């Protein structure tokens, strides 16, 4: 049947419409074009006389590809260049052929690399193709770390790469990329302010030479941070701090967290290569202890105690501070207090109170503390869908989750906030994953995990989300398109665990 329809297109037999594209003419059939294209359906089925000739502003190659798709269902996209695919997307989008657009997007994603990611990102941004934009953006951070690729960029492309990654990578990577680009050609120094403006760091009173010298001096004093990592830090099933490469499943135990130092139901966060174990139970009673373990020096130390006894608390790092939220106190009551502390401070300080809760998800999103869902009644388990952020020392309500949820994990990936897993109505564990859309202030459900999880650990590791633990040993990876199981790693269930990307300098990996 497909060959028969294609022959009608090739021969023009029984055609009733002529489509003109440049110097080329195509003989088509209104019923077939209307079947596949929203544009042609409206054009040929209105209350006015249907035209016999249609002119399209597209290349004849793009029109031929789109027509072949409509008549034969074969897309002929395998050997197409990115430029070809972009031309087809523009035409297919104009004609309202969504499936062909999606297929072209998938083909482009498979071809994106550091050499073409800026052009792909610009195209996706222009035509509002969100999925393609996200995929291209994952390569922009890698582009900043590639000396050869970044210094060859035009000024406009360098500005795009810097602008879109300035809130994702560290300042050292930004400064290094800017200086590398300027040093490539002597006359580029005059364009320095344009690049600096892309990262919102411009001072009108400074000339380009002053800015260059300041950046060079600042870069000298910075500790090098890797643009990529080779392992993830977790607390494993037997309470060892373990380094794991999720791709190869290489692992190494580096220390044991003894129960006489800290009991169970503690909360783990990591900042600047130091693990912090917060609260928990010791001899069955909640504590306010804070134990630090330095991954680089292999040393333990006690930090200032929290102001409240708490177990099963939630915590995260925000702008260099550790924030601890909720939990259960020594009288088995839910806690509404929020505390914060940073290394060097002699004591913890109180942040504004919240509704008493436990198993709320915490995350640093756009340099602010966000809390998502949680449990507000232990004896008659009651989950909430509330989402709040701490802005100017007060809590602001954001768009709630589509359904009440407790014990989820949250992570920022490609500048987007994700809420993963947890418990929903009736206490059932879930594999649902939601993405927060800033533009519309709504939550969008994306691909589900293969496994249901409560209180999993999660981190972004080398351009993908990795989820570990949460009542299963299965490790899953999300690349922005789909979830994939990559192995099995056991994590310690009697704590609110962490998963922290890390660069291990030993040659064992």
Curated annotation (Swiss-Prot):
Keywords in alphabetical order: Kelch repeat, Repeat
The UniProt record lists the keyword Lyase: no
Kelch repeat ranges, renumbered to this chain: 274-320, 321-368, 370-415, 416-463, 465-509
UniProt keyword annotation of Membrane present: no
Domain of life, per lineage: Viruses
BTB domain location: 15-79
Protein family: Belongs to the poxviruses Kelch family.
PANTHER family on file: KELCH PROTEIN, RING FINGER DOMAIN AND KELCH REPEAT-CONTAINING PROTEIN DDB_G0271372
Protein name (Swiss-Prot/TrEMBL): Kelch repeat protein M-T9
Organism: Myxoma virus (strain Lausanne) (MYXV)
């Amino acid at each position: 049947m497909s060959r028969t329809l294609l022959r009608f297109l090739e021969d023009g037999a029984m055609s009733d419409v002529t489509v003109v594209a440049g110097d080329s003419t195509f003989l088509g059939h209104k019923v077939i074009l209307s079947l596949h294209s929203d544009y042609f359906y409206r054009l040929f089925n209105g209350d006015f006389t249907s035209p016999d000739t249609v002119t399209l502003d597209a290349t004849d190659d793009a029109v031929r590809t789109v027509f072949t798709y409509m008549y034969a269902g074969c897309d002929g996209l395998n050997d197409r260049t990115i430029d070809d695919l972009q031309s087809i997307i523009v035409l297919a989008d104009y004609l309202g052929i969504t499936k062909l657009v999606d297929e072209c997007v998938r083909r482009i994603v498979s071809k994106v690399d550091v050499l073409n990611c800026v052009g792909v990102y610009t195209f996706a941004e222009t035509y509002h193709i969100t999925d393609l934009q996200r995929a291209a953006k994952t390569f922009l951070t890698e582009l900043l770390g590639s000396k050869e690729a970044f210094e060859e960029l035009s000024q406009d492309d360098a500005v795009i790469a810097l602008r879109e990654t300035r809130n994702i990578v560290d300042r050292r990577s930004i400064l290094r990329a800017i200086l590398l680009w300027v040093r490539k050609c002597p006359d580029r120094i005059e364009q320095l302010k344009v690049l600096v403006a892309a990262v919102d760091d411009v001072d009108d009173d400074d000339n380009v030479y002053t800015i260059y010298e300041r950046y060079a001096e600042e870069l000298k004093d910075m500790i090098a941070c890797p643009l990529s990592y080779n392992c993830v830090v977790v607390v494993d099933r037997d309470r060892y701090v373990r380094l794991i490469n999720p791709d190869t499943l290489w692992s190494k135990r580096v220390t044991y967290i003894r129960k006489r130092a800290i009991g169970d139901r503690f909360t783990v966060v990591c900042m600047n290569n130091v693990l912090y174990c917060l609260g928990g139970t010791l001899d069955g009673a909640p504590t306010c202890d804070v134990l630090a373990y330095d991954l680089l020096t292999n040393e333990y130390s006690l930090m200032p105690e929290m102001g409240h006894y708490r177990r099963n608390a939630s915590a995260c790092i925000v702008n260099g501070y550790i924030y601890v939220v909720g939990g259960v106190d020594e009288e088995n009551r839910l806690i509404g207090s929020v505390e914060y502390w940073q290394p060097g401070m002699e004591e913890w300080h109180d942040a504004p109170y919240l509704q008493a809760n436990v198993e709320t998800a915490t995350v640093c999103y756009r340099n602010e503390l966000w809390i998502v869902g949680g449990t507000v009644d232990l004896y008659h388990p009651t989950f909430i869908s509330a989402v709040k952020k701490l802005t100017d020392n007060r809590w602001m309500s954001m768009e709630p989750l589509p359904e009440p949820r407790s014990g989820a994990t949250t992570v920022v990936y490609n500048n987007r906030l994700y809420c993963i897993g947890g418990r929903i109505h009736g206490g059932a564990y879930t594999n649902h994953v939601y993405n927060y859309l800033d533009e519309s202030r709504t939550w969008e459900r994306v691909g589900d995990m293969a496994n249901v999880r409560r209180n999993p650990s999660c981190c972004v590791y080398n351009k993908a989300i990795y989820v570990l633990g949460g009542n299963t040993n299965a490790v899953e990876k999300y690349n922005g398109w789909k979830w994939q199981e990559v192995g099995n790693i056991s994590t310690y269930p009697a704590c609110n665990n962490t998963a922290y990307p890390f660069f291990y300098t030993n040659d064992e990996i």
